[in-house]
Amino acid sequence: MAKFQGYLEFDGARQQSFLYPLFFREYIYVLAYDHGLNRLNRNRSIFLENSDYGKKYSSLIVKRLILRMYEQNRLIIPTKDLNQNPFLGHTNLVDYQMISILFAVIVEIPFSLRLGSSFEGKQLKKSYNLQSIHSIFPFLEDKLSHFNYVVDVLIPYPIHLEILVQTLRYRVKDPSSLHFFRFCLYEYCNWKNFDIKKKSILNPRFFLFLYNSHVCEYESIFFFLRKRSSHLRSTSYEVLFERILFYGKIQHFLKVFVNTFPAILGLLKDPFIHYVRYHGKCILATKDTPLLMNKWKYFFVNLWQCYFSVWFQSQKVNIKQLSKDNLEFLGYLSSLRLNPLVVRSQMLENAFLIDNVRIKLDSKIPISSIIGSLAKDKFCNVLGHPISKAAWTDSSDSDILNRFVRICRNISHYYSGSSKKKNLYRIKYILRLCCVKTLARKHKSTVRAFLKRLGSGLLEEFLTGEDQVLSLIFPRSYYASKRLYRVRIWYLDILYLNDLVNHE
């Protein structure tokens, strides 16, 4: 990013309208192609002159696209011509793929510059451990054990493209770029049902940016309600809702709501509340009664339906009591568990036994969904009985073994924070026996004969790093006892959900 900083310097008079000219600058395409900025992008091959030979950036493709962008009519292909010549649709698809990659990079520029200017003069401590998914669970263990109820919300996606355009309009003050963005989106959706589209999608980074912008707009309203409820009389909240309602779209409802807004916030005021969002879901934890939880529930429904014009069903907001219900979050089932403790206290000659009850957050593995995911991938049947992986029998023995070991260690690594390891051991047993059955099927032998020939050394490959570390730290007597059965380890290097968690 530093080597392109000179290109991004512009005077203050052009700050509001500098984005659109960048679409016609070749160096921005080089910036989009840069591997450091696109390490998560799988569509970089469209910038290559030949993806199988050379792996070089093609300036000719970029120049042709820029020439077509000067005349936007050349980017429009009528449906009649698309049916007669599908190759035109393929060419147009490549153009829009390149534009989506470029748009994701260009629109992020003002956001990054604004974020950098807000941190000037401030000393920020970098904590890479907070990037881990497992860093959320220690926070939940510390906070949720003191709360009673949780509101589990599935964040809806905007149905209409204009909602995304209007949301982006609040932050990008460049009309030309927004018009071009709207044009590309609608043109892309006009022919998305054709066969040329089935194996191609727009840039994932582009849609991730749009989704985050949409969620950021929703959270700005929520945090406004949460933080400004103590000084409503001095807050000009009419302007806020006028911006959200897309330029007076529901004027009558706006007047009614503004008049009753202080009373609504008074009902939602709660000093003890925590908010966590990840992977399209958010949870709201509080100590309050079910009555206030129902008010929050209908607040979310009205917020999405009235202010964002997104149809949102009340069934997507679940109110759960942690002492009775399980909270499904990031592949774990979490609930509060009462842990009784007996403390012996002695004062002089008198001794007392004091019964204490400590509330702990119990995180368990959703074994049913994991077995369903394993059955879908042909590791076992729907009952959890291991079967051979027939599709892998053409690979070498070492390749088959390495695949199973890698899957087993990834699962053990991700679910190391489970309070009870019984379900984890069952998953590892399924994978081990599936591996043995696959190897036995390849060599046309039985499982018993195959294990007798190789011995127990084959199963030692499945010993995870966690088991090796714990066996070195704790004594053998402790390692073999049931105490280690409840040891929970949260790793701070897990940045993505496990594939089995995303089985749905």
UniProtKB/Swiss-Prot annotation:
It comes from the Eukaryota. InterPro entries: Domain_X, Maturase_MatK, Maturase_MatK_N. Pfam families: Intron_maturas2, MatK_N. GO terms for molecular function: RNA binding. It is found in: Plastid, Chloroplast. GO terms for biological process: mRNA processing; RNA splicing; tRNA processing. Keywords: Chloroplast, mRNA processing, Plastid, RNA-binding, tRNA processing. The keyword tRNA processing applies. GO terms for cellular component: chloroplast. Belongs to the intron maturase 2 family. MatK subfamily. Usually encoded in the trnK tRNA gene intron. Probably assists in splicing its own and other chloroplast group II introns. This is Maturase K.
